[in-house]
């Protein structure tokens, strides 16, 4: 396989005042959790470690990677509603915000990937892409109206709206259960250590997944495929594959590209808990999956919802969601429709 050369992109200019303005709602919490994660190392037991790793898979694999990312953001597959809600609760316990916030940020990332407006592009620095955008930045300071523009589907779901408002509740309940079962030691490992590992696993996809690795597809961003990022993120490290074909539930497109979340989705299909699965495979140039809304190859998004929930049926969910009735937004929407998007070419 020939590796496609990464794009040479100019840095995104982030307002320096914004970069220096600490998010006091987030920074102290992250500091506390990192202190707790370090403290857990002094109270090590194998039982506590295995509990932490199991919860890491439940919250990071089933929750973030499979539910927040592939199910809610990209609608790569569907599940019964009760199971979708269960997976969402698992994701919320990862301490990465409620479903409306997480999905809105990720859809915006795909809309502006490595361009002005991307919440966490490494074009403004590796640290910014990893955690700087969380500790400072404006990505987590989104009002309800802004969120609804990016997630009109989730905004109509009362459960997702409620869970976004009370997203700390599942973590509090989990902590209480762990304390009742195994005392403070189990809380240190099952809450603090597990959460910190999960946070950095997510952040490293945003940073390393756009810096180091190989590029099978010539996408118009800097996304890369990275095997070790894929291992810690349950398959999301095949990031160039994902940016080439966002609607695909399968990120590891080759047999040797380990994608644990894809294996889980396949198992769920066998037991009747997953259906309408979009399985992207390299075939010279990628084509939109059956049922996908007409869009550019880079932002294809299959929506099970009526087109009336979208601002424009001709654009992807996270592309058209930023439009409103203002003249400037209408001009931007027309420009997006006319934008020249050459076919993706797979490098073998």
Predicted features along the sequence, with ranges:
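Active-site-proximal inter-transmembrane loops
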Residues: 150-158, 212-238, 243-245
